[in-house]
């Protein structure tokens, strides 16, 4: 019997939670990962290697999907100290991906090589073969370029789009990305930052078109917390409305919403300063937009913060897959 094909789309902070749990299931996994990051280590590497697709999100996804021993993982994720000169703040894995990207001719090729080396469960694809610049247009008409600058701009985001950083052309999807979406049984969007992790992938025209054409079940994992500079005062219905608006029509089949209350002591603004308050529920608004709304306890409290429980999310996704068979 053919294994179900599940493709997860997003960034390197949110989707590893899902990918780690999917590895335990009898499914074929693919991850499509944003390449619009221009902050931190990825941003510094982009300044010095203009052809480089930012490696940070890809690094985290690689670790989540690999069978590397814990020591290898620590080495790959090791971040140089602030007194390390030119290497300060860079994770070793980012430097390895950057070096292999140059050696192999592209980040796509580098990720395929690293996936074999670390025995990943599934395929990892950058959403584009070129570094992208994320642009946010705010409701007052002002525009900000660069993912790392968007959250600091006051006001509400109206929409976002991406350009090829190298020449401002309309970006193309990376190899096999469109085919992977069209051949999937399920597409999972998120969890992760709405405007800076999920949308930078799906506003690539070829990817957006594939999402509208695929016969796969499309599930969106709604965020638990609102995010500073992105989704302040958003309900869960608002998140879905933004996704649909960016592709021009409704395309999500299922939304998964956490209804477990986050204890006040886990709303740690000192440690997680980008997260504000728990997302409010608007089930009437969701039901107008989505055929299936699954609300349950998907909460995991860990390290002083509130996160999605990957096992609970994936168990629900597997139930949906079984119903579709």
Label every PLM stretch briefly.
Residues 14-19, 196-203:
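Short glycine/serine/threonine-rich phosphate/pyrophosphate-binding segments
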Residues 130-195:
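Active-site gating loop/helix substructures
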Residues 27, 214-218, 290-291:
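A short helix->loop->beta-strand "cap" motif at the edges of active sites that frequently abuts
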Residues 201-208, 234-239:
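Charged helix-capping and loop-helix junction motifs
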Residues 1-6, 20-23, 28-31, 119, ...:
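Non-transmembrane, aqueous-exposed alpha-helical and coiled segments at domain scale
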Residues 36-156, 316, 323:
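Electropositive, gly/pro-rich neighborhoods at or near active sites that engage anionic ligands
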Residues 1-55:
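Gly/lys/ser-thr-rich phosphate-binding loops in alpha/beta enzymes
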Residues 233-325:
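C-terminal functional extensions of proteins
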């Amino acid at each position: 019997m053919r294994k179900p094909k599940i493709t997860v789309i997003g960034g390197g902070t949110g989707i590893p939670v899902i990918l780690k749990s999917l590895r335990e299931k009898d499914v074929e996994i693919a991850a499509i990962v944003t390449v619009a990051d221009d902050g931190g280590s990825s941003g510094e590497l982009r300044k010095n290697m203009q052809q480089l697709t930012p490696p940070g999100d890809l690094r985290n996804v690689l670790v989540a999907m690999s069978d590397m021993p814990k020591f290898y993982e620590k080495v790959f994720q090791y971040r140089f100290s602030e007194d390390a000169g030119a290497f300060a703040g860079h994770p070793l894995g980012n430097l390895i991906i950057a070096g292999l990207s140059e050696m192999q001719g592209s980040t796509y090729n580098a990720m395929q090589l690293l996936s074999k080396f670390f025995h990943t469960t599934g395929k990892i694809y950058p959403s584009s073969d070129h570094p992208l610049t994320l642009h946010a247009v705010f409701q007052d008409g002002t525009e900000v370029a660069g993912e790392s600058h968007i959250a600091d701009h006051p006001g509400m985001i109206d929409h976002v789009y991406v350009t090829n950083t190298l020449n401002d052309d309309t970006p193309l999807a990376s190899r096999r990305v469109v085919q992977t979406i069209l051949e999937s049984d399920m597409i999972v969007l998120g969890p992760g930052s709405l405007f800076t992790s999920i949308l930078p992938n799906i506003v690539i025209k070829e990817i957006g078109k594939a999402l509208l054409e695929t016969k796969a079940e499309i599930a969106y994992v709604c965020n638990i917390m609102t995010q500073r500079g992105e989704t302040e005062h958003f309900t869960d219905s608002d998140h879905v409305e933004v996704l649909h608006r960016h592709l021009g029509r409704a395309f999500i089949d299922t939304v998964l919403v956490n209804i477990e209350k986050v204890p006040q002591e886990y709303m740690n603004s000192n440690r997680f300063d980008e997260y504000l308050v728990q997302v409010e529920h608007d089930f009437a608004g969701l039901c107008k937009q989505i055929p299936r709304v699954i609300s349950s306890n998907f909460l995991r409290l860990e390290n002083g913060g509130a996160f999605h429980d990957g096992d609970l999310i994936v168990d629900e996704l597997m139930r949906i897959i079984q119903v579709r068979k």
